[in-house]
């Protein structure tokens, strides 16, 4: 097979973007050569822990340095702390960016789970991660101790990592009462208060009592979706905060009246404490020059006595943004590579069976039908936003979801009537299948509205994905119901067939499409693994990332795959029939495809956060985790839309893009989240 000049050019551009982006990201990850970054694994006592060790070039057993352990929050991994890791290590600190248990490359021993309930698998990972990492780092010869053997280690974590850090500080003081040695010298939590540590007995008063004269701080964002709440205010947590004026904030700072943010306070035990209050949201903390500057300033203050061992670089002097920028460049190359690889494969023997012929471009509807079509498209775009909160936060049987139950019943009855009419009047195979699709989609929509799903954590072992999966299957069935109803009521009368939706029932096209998707993803991930091995870089921007993973999560990927496959089959069919018209060629077709996939989430997020920043209370103040999760869904669904439109044009059907998107996005999602029972 001879590649066209365009294909060769696109392949070269993709590879150059990946290689150049990864190499430069790797350069800035090392602080422009100031540190060496390696991935390490060690026995943490409760399982296997992993992390990225940032070792200053002059640190060694003969020249030990103060150390800082940084870790991520729930559903993330070590790379989410790259800003702190890069900036602290280039200033001379030894830094361990830690994967908490059951995140990234770390895994909790199964015996540690108390049971298979959410609480039973959720509590052990963060309660133990930071404390276990402290024990490991204290034993390393390149980590500095004082003349009394006390460890010069700082602990910093975001969100659940912050809770883990708070517990590590408390546990260290308890352990020091017996050993006479404090291993942790100071700690800065980001995006966490004492809400969850109180579950294990460490509330604000206890943490204060166990301070032990340490230097401690908190980053408490003013618009944090979860924490730092005024206990006198009810009605949801997604609102403006002022933690220094709350009882817990004052207790932490040992003040009897509302304190000042960004101000150091001396404590009765000889320590110092500070609360920083950036005007940010929860996930904004770990993608912020301001918060990173706070971390730098905090540790420069905490370890001021050892300044001669460190580099005096101002907090505002930061380079981590370049690492993020070049990883984004590599991300663009990665997506390009996937599309180009799939296009090359379908020209090869066997794989070319994935193609079923070029789809004829349909005439765009005119007059009243055009208006009706755009109104239907608007509804299709809005529905995922309208039902996002009920599906994500309410769940089966909740009032909002029950609207879908009744809508599903109406659709199923309408589909059954259309089916009976098609049979009675002998309207043909298309009319019969259309009636069946409408009946089944409506019935299934009604069923999932009443049926609790993804509840067994022994099976659905990625808790953070379960609500996403429920919303996804709800969106898939809403879309399928609309597609079926429009076909029965409009499209069939216009002469449309399943070919217009990209639906081919040829077995070999389906099998070859699956094989094309699998081989494409294997090759693309091999490139990702190579970049990780060479440069310790992956492909990401903020919370959206394609990263390496362990084989232990493959069973979880396979369990969630059917849910996301259903969504991408329906999504690709909808994109195919709605963008393959004479008025939507080129960029306009891609734009509509993106809106069909990601328009709902974009609208929901815009309303949520514009309302939050303008009024101080979000449009949905009870949607904390779900609003954060939705941020990464925007690039996920947008990229999937581009892949769907590009590949249906090349194959003439939905199967290759649907399989590719489902496998790719499910793998990406599971690799970036907590997975229990690995």
Language-model segments: what does each one mean?
Residues 1-7, 317-321, 361-368:
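Short, Lys/Arg-rich N-terminal segment immediately upstream of the first membrane anchor
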Residues 317-331:
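Juxtamembrane/start-of-transmembrane alpha-helix segments at the extracytoplasmic/lumenal side
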Residues 3-43, 50-53:
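An N-terminal hydrophobic leader/cap segment in hydrolases
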Residues 375-678:
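Alpha-helical transmembrane segments of integral membrane proteins
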């Amino acid at each position: 097979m001879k590649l066209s000049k365009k294909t060769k050019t696109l392949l070269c551009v993709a590879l150059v973007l990946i290689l150049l982006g990864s190499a430069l990201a790797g350069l800035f990850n090392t602080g422009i050569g100031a540190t060496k970054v390696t991935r390490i694994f060690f026995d943490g006592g409760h399982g296997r822990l992993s992390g990225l060790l940032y070792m200053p070039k002059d640190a060694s057993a003969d020249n030990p340095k103060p150390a800082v352990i940084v870790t991520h929050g729930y559903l993330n991994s070590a790379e989410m702390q790259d800003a702190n890791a890069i900036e602290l290590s280039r200033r001379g600190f030894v830094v361990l960016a830690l994967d908490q248990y059951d995140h990234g490359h770390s895994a909790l021993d199964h015996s540690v789970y108390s049971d298979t309930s959410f609480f039973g698998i959720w509590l052990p990972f963060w309660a133990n991660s930071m404390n276990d990492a402290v024990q490991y780092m204290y034993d390393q010869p390149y980590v500095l101790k004082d003349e009394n053997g006390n460890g010069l280690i700082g602990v910093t974590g975001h969100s659940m990592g912050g809770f883990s850090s708070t517990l590590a500080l408390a546990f260290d003081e308890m352990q020091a009462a017996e050993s006479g040695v404090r291993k942790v010298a100071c700690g800065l939590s980001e995006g966490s208060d004492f809400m969850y540590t109180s579950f294990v007995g460490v509330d604000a008063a206890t943490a204060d009592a166990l301070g032990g004269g340490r230097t401690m701080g908190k980053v408490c964002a003013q618009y944090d979706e979860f924490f730092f709440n005024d206990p006198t205010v009810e009605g949801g947590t997604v609102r403006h905060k002022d933690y220094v004026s709350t009882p817990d904030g004052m207790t932490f700072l040992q003040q009897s009246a509302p304190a000042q943010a960004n101000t150091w306070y001396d404590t009765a035990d000889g320590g110092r404490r500070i609360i920083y209050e950036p005007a940010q949201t929860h996930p904004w903390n770990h993608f912020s020059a301001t918060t990173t500057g706070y971390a730098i300033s905090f540790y420069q203050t905490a370890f001021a006595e050892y300044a001669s061992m460190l580099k005096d670089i101002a907090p505002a002097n930061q380079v981590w943004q370049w690492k993020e920028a070049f990883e984004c460049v590599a991300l663009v190359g990665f997506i390009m590579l996937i599309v180009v690889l799939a296009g090359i494969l379908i020209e090869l023997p066997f794989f070319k069976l994935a193609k079923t012929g070029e789809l004829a471009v349909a005439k765009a509807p005119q007059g009243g039908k055009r208006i009706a079509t755009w109104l239907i498209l608007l509804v299709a775009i809005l529905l995922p936003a309208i039902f996002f909160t009920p599906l994500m936060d309410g769940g089966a049987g909740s009032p909002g979801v029950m609207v879908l139950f009744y809508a599903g019943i109406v659709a199923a009855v309408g589909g059954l009537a259309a089916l009976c009419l098609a049979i009675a009047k002998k309207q043909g195979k298309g009319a019969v299948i259309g009636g069946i699709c409408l009946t089944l989609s409506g019935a299934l929509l009604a069923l999932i509205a009443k049926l609790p799903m993804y509840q067994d954590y022994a099976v659905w072992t990625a808790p953070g994905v379960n609500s996403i999966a429920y919303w996804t299957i709800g969106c898939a069935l809403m879309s399928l119901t609309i597609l079926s109803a429009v076909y029965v009521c409009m499209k069939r009368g216009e002469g449309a067939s399943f070919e217009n939706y990209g639906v081919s029932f040829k077995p070999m096209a389906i099998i070859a499409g699956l094989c094309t998707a699998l081989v494409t993803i294997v090759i693309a991930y091999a490139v990702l693994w190579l970049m990780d091995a060479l440069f310790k870089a992956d492909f990401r921007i903020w919370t959206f990332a394609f990263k390496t993973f362990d084989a232990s999560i493959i069973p979880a990927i396979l369990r969630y795959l059917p849910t996301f496959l259903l969504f991408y089959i329906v999504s690709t069919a909808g994109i195919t029939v709605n963008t393959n018209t004479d008025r939507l060629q080129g960029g306009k077709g891609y734009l509509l495809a993106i809106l069909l996939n990601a328009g709902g989430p974009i609208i929901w997020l815009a309303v949520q956060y514009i309302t939050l920043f303008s009024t101080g209370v979000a449009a949905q103040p009870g949607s904390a985790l779900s609003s954060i999760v939705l941020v990464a869904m925007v690039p996920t669904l947008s990229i999937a839309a581009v892949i769907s439109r590009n590949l249906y044009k090349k194959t003439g059907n939905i199967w290759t893009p649907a399989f590719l998107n489902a496998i790719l996005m499910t793998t990406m999602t599971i690799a970036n989240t907590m997975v229990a029972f690995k």
